[in-house]
Amino acid sequence: ISLWSLILKNNWSKKIANEYIKKYKKLGFSSDLALRVYTTRLLGRNKELVLHGGGNTSVKTTIKDIDGKNYKVLCVKGSGWDMADIEPPGLPAVKLEPLLALKNKKYLSDEDMVSYQKRNLIDIKSPNPSVETFLHAFLPFKYVDHTHADAVLNVTNRPGGLNFCKKVFGNKVSIVPYVMPGFMLAKKIHEIYSKNPNINCLILMNHGIFTFANNCKEAYDLMIKYVSKAERAVKKLKSKKLKQIKKFSTKFNPHEIAPIIRGLLSDNKDQKFVINYRLNSHLKYFINGKSVRTYSSKGTATPDHVIRVKPFPLIITPKKNSTIEEFRSNAIKAFENYRKKYIRYFNINHKKVKGKKVMLDTSPRVILVQNVGMFSVGKDLNAAKIAGDLTDTNARVITSVEETSTYKFIPEK
């Protein structure tokens, strides 16, 4: 199955860029910020680059504060904003010098990092700056772009991914082993850049890609260039079709089993959930793979997705010609096993992480019913659809890697 129909298109338009500058000048915003909004939207509107709040961008510029002084600031994507429809308030300005002052600090907890970033906002009412704010600050370029490009994850999320990256991306790119987003990742990036000041791109294993330049168009062009390189490299690999289970019919429709699934989701007095059903050609291919229980449980395409879809789906295989009653008893067992598996997963990983963590409810966010389709789960319809969109992307990336190699994600931590 082909992951991409076409090589990624560069959508930059000088005319539209100038229109953004004029529009935002009237609203009191600089051309720096206007162009940042423009290319952030260009990146955010391509679903093969980012989805639903994923990715981030920044620009280093100067802003006059209420005291009349000019401050060097980092305007970086804030939480709660999507790149696809960002506005200047979605790029909160953080004073740059206090961020740079921590370059040599050895450790900063997530809580202290968030507090420090908020303390240095120009406008305290702004949204929280990205968890990757320090990373953006430590790269000495005006414009920094970050996406979770499907094609890049296809290159990184496989055995030998590190060497494959070196071969694909060339000598202007540094490859970074996986580090959880936050201050320690920013420190690692600073260390790598200091040793390789000629690079214009970073590939973060199992995470995504950063490109940077002092010109907005150039940073965007670099993103398109390197993601296109990844696309071309994957297209050249030898591929094999994934073995599929046999097609069979059941004596029920998706809409008949939806109430059963919804009831089981709330069976242990968890919050009430909404579910969304979908099926398309590549989801069908993913769900009906003989090895779906193996490859779907290895991890999401990028850790960002875990927040919305949990680390693994629940999978149900109905029996041939099974009735709705038979499906119900099959589903009850599957849900019981999933809840036990999730509790085990949390307990194992909780011991490995500093600080106290609170376990979420034990209900799945994605249910794959073979020969039927996918049911995505959320607290409302929008959240359920987002879980579905992310699973759609995970299905594309995982099956594409499985066709050419073996899907591999970061070890559990």
Features from the language model and the residues they span:
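Glycine-rich flexible loops
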Residues: 7-413
